[in-house]
Amino acid sequence: MKSINDLIKENKFVSLPLGKKFSCAFKDWKPTKSGNGVLMQFNATEITTAKTYSGIMWLANNSVQNEEFDKTEKFIIETESELNADGYVVINMVD
């Protein structure tokens, strides 16, 4: 399996579709050089269609708050239906 550093070098950034819910596992993460967030290595499965996505995504600092993610835990996340003012997909953790 490729490391997060390999994926970054290969530019394997993935943008999840808007307005969808996913079962997601975060495999690894590292802070960005600029300190404005983290790069997350992930696998996600869209709940309604079972379509899978994998690669890396950038999460803003306010999305993560330096949380330690349990790499064995699955999370349910959802994307908002519109891009934010900066043109990024906003991802929310679902309780």
Predicted regions, residues:
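Short nucleic-acid-contacting surface segments enriched for D/E, G, S/T with interspersed K/R
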Residues: 17, 22, 61-78
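OB-fold ssDNA-binding interfaces and closely related basic DNA-contact patches used
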Residues: 1-50
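N-terminal compositionally biased, intrinsically disordered segments and leader/signal-like regions
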Residues: 46-53, 73, 80
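Low-complexity, intrinsically disordered/propeptide-like segments
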Residues: 10, 42-45, 62, 72, ...
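OB-fold/S1-family single-stranded nucleic acid-binding modules
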Residues: 80-95
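A beta-strand/beta-hairpin structural motif
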Residues: 56-59
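A generic signature of intrinsically disordered, low-complexity regions enriched in glycine/proline
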Residues: 50, 70, 74, 88-91
